[in-house]
């Protein structure tokens, strides 16, 4: 049997278990894969957009989709309610047109805030898909001028081996190797020997941030703006953290840690992180477009300036034009 066209709104996920902390396994990718295997003339399906940059178990599917030159068009809705008014789907939704005879760039249309922007795109330009057409020129400038990105030093989840629910003792132990454990709740105390990962960071000055984004999987506030990063903090020597946080950097001097913390507060950095987000959790890969800086006193950035002034220095350093500056300033909240 031959199909000329396959059209569908496949089931998005299968929930595993009955407890509130259980999760869903994506299903829509399997329907898309089967449809492509059938090889009709056309396929069009609407799915969550989370596959652009993340999603549990979607890495292989994402690479397959980004490398598929038969995808003629994608129509993306950052806010799923623009497509389904009564349904909130984290990361938005999108539908695509697959054409067996098409073998060139994809016409990608992004819908956001009542506006639509269309651009011919090479889907596999990066190992994730940047849904914001307006951000591409800035990303190209930054990558052309940068040897190392910040993701190279961001810790993976559970940086010291303690899950989010783990708690140590309420009071410090008499053992001199006792260190403080920061969690999303109150601080507690653990022995150094209980730290199973990254012991080399324990005695350094660290910058940590919450693994959860401030927004609901990339959904803006009512003004169309984002904060992106929620909790940011300095973690002193002899302090570690649970899985609730990731470590952005660990330094021998407090000055470098302070300057990294300031850098993460800039609109420039948070705008670049935003381009990788379609889910609520942050990971090292979300910092793939953020250039690593010199955080010492020898830096070409004056870190003693205000965050607003540092943003201006970064705009100058990376040749950010007025249109790009306006987009950043209007998209990202002050922090």
Which ranges hold each PLM region?
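Conserved NAD(P)H cofactor-binding loop of Rossmann-fold oxidoreductase domains
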Residues: 10
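C-terminal substrate-recognition regions of SAM-dependent nucleic acid methyltransferases
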Residues: 80-242, 246-301, 305-312, 319-322
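Short amphipathic alpha-helical surface patches that mediate protein-protein
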Residues: 48, 265, 330-333
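Short, amphipathic C-terminal "tail helix"
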Residues: 323-335
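S-adenosyl-L-methionine
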Residues: 1
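Flexible loop/turn segments at secondary-structure boundaries
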Residues: 15, 52-53, 216-218, 335
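Hydrophobic beta-strand segment of the Class I
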Residues: 6-7
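Conserved Class I SAM-dependent methyltransferase catalytic core
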Residues: 14-82, 94-98, 260
């Amino acid at each position: 049997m031959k199909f000329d066209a396959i059209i569908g709104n496949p089931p998005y996920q299968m929930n595993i278990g009955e407890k509130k902390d259980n999760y869903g396994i994506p299903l829509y990718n399997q329907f898309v894969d089967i449809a492509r295997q059938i090889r009709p003339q056309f396929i069009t399906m609407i799915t969550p957009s989370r596959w652009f940059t993340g999603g549990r178990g979607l890495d292989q599917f994402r690479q397959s989709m980004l490398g598929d030159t038969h995808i003629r068009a994608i129509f993306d809705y950052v806010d799923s309610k623009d497509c389904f008014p009564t349904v909130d789907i984290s990361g938005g939704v999108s539908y695509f047109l697959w054409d067996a005879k098409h073998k060139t760039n994809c016409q990608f249309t992004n819908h956001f805030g009542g506006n639509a922007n269309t651009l011919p795109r090479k889907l596999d330009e990066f190992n994730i898909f940047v849904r914001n057409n307006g951000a591409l020129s800035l990303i190209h400038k930054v990558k052309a001028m940068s040897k190392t990105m910040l993701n190279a030093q961001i810790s993976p989840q559970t940086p010291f081996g303690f899950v989010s629910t783990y708690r140590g003792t309420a009071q410090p132990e008499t053992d001199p190797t006792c260190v403080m454990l920061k969690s999303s709740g109150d601080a507690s105390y653990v022995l150094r020997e209980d730290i199973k990962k990254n012991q080399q960071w324990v005695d350094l000055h660290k910058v940590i941030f919450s693994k959860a984004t401030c927004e609901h999987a990339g959904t803006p506030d009512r003004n169309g703006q984002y904060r992106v990063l929620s909790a940011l903090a300095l973690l002193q020597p002899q302090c570690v953290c649970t899985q609730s946080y990731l470590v952005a950097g660990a330094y021998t001097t407090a000055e470098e840690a302070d300057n990294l913390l300031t850098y993460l507060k800039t609109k420039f950095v948070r705008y670049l992180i935003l381009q990788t987000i379609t889910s609520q959790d942050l990971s090292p890969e979300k910092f793939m477009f953020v250039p690593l800086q010199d955080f010492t006193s020898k830096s070409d950035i004056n870190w003693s300036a205000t965050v607003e002034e540092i943003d201006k220095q970064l705009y100058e350093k990376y040749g950010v034009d007025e249109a790009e500056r306006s987009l950043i300033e209007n998209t990202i909240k002050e922090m």
